[in-house]
Amino acid sequence: MAREKIRIKKIDNITARQVTFSKRRRGIFKKADELSVLCDADVALIIFSATGKLFEFSSSRMRDILGRYSLHASNINKLMDPPSTHLRLENCNLSRLSKEVEDKTKQLRKLRGEDLDGLNLEELQRLEKLLESGLSRVSEKKGECVMSQIFSLEKRGSELVDENKRLRDKLETLERAKLTTLKEALETESVTTNVSSYDSGTPLEDDSDTSLKLGLPSWE
């Protein structure tokens, strides 16, 4: 047989009400203590009786638990508060930037030749002019780059010509110095050779007029 569901309502009899309050209070405190031990939870209960008497239970220091509750409630209230003027302005700027990014992305896709099906003749002509203008700027920039490279190459070529001339002049100077040294060496060697030949091959001159003549004297 099913148990009849007890209807919960205020107990009119004051004595019965106080007895029930005492029993239920002890029961709920016991359940809170079990919850704290079994689940390693911080539990705090505050009960005021009908006469205004305070009853409390806490698994740790009541002040610490209430402090955590106050901090948590404060954070929730901040989240529930309407956004500040600064935050609304930031959201507005974010929406504007997102719209600009979306528009630029669409424009870029069209410049690539994509998503052109929905464009009318006027929009296509405007896109064509935009492409022509962009192509003109690209060509102009390309010309500037080419001229810059030509200038750099010409400058490098001039530097190489100057360097080549400097090396050639240096080489000619070295060759002239080498020839001068060789010529001086040959001249010195020639003088030495002539002196040696003179000392060994030239006979001494005889200053004496004495001579031996045989035969009859000639009569003129």
From Swiss-Prot:
Q: Name one GO molecular function term.
A: RNA polymerase II transcription regulatory region sequence-specific DNA binding
Designated name of the protein: MADS-box protein AGL24
Gene name per UniProt: AGL24
Taxonomic lineage is:
Eukaryota, Viridiplantae, Streptophyta, Embryophyta, Tracheophyta
Origin organism is Arabidopsis thaliana (Mouse-ear cress)
Domain K-box: residue ranges: 87-177
Key words of the record: Activator, Cytoplasm, Developmental protein, Differentiation, DNA-binding, Flowering, Nucleus, Phosphoprotein, Transcription, Transcription regulation
Q: In which tissues is it expressed?
A: Mostly expressed in shoot apical meristems, including floral meristems. Also detected in stems, seedlings, leaves, flowers and siliques, and, to a lower extent, in roots.
Entry PTM = Phosphorylated by IMK3. Induced by vernalization.
- Main localization (coarse): nucleus
Polar residues: bias regions: 190-200
Provide the MADS-box domain boundaries: 1-61
